[in-house]
């Protein structure tokens, strides 16, 4: 509601300024333009504005550009990596289980003296080995090759 009042005030003040300053400008400025009036245009009020129909206007058919069809899910093993993926090969576990090294590491982490040592528990599935495959991980090339 406040915006409507401000807008109305601005329109009225701009019209008042136009009428006031339009009647006080020199004669040679009134005659400049494409048309020279033998009278002051403000003397007869506002000039009529051509009416345009309100509401939605019917439009003709518009041409449609062909859209690329979305590709269905493809098997990652069938995709061939392109040359732009040459520097982004990362070997990851493709078997779906946790990979542990086949040999235990010899380095023991140092723990504070107040903690109780617990022996490491072997995870199931580690004895079965890990299958590793090359995956192209960075965004331009998210393609996995068959596991080795």
Curated annotation (Swiss-Prot):
Pro residues bias locations: 52-73
Propeptide feature: residues: 19-43
Keywords of this entry: Glycoprotein, Repeat, Signal
Sequence repeats, residue ranges: 46-50, 54-58, 59-63, 64-68, 71-75
Signal peptide, first to last residue: 1-18
Posttranslational modification: O-glycosylated.
Residue ranges of the region described as Disordered: 52-80
Region described as Repeat-rich region: spans on this chain: 46-75
Family as reported in the entry's similarity comment: To B.pahangi filarial sheath protein.
Protein name as it appears in the record: Major microfilarial sheath protein
Annotated source species: Litomosoides carinii
Highest classification ranks of the organism: Eukaryota, Metazoa, Ecdysozoa, Nematoda, Chromadorea
Originating gene: GP22
């Amino acid at each position: 509601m406040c915006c409507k009042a401000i807008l109305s005030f601005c329109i009225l003040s701009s019209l008042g300024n136009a009428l006031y300053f339009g009647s006080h400008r020199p004669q040679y400025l009134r005659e400049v333009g494409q048309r020279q009036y033998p009278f002051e245009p403000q003397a007869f009020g506002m000039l009529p504005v051509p009416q345009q129909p309100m509401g939605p206007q019917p439009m003709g058919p518009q041409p449609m550009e062909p859209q690329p069809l979305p590709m269905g899910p493809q098997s990652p093993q069938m995709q061939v990596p392109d040359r732009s993926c040459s520097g982004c090969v990362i070997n990851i576990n493709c078997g779906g289980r946790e990979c542990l090294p086949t040999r235990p590491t010899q380095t023991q982490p140092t723990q504070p003296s107040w903690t109780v040592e617990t022996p490491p528990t072997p995870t199931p599935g580690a004895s079965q080995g890990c299958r590793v495959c090359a995956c192209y991980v960075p965004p331009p090339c998210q393609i996995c090759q068959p596991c080795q």
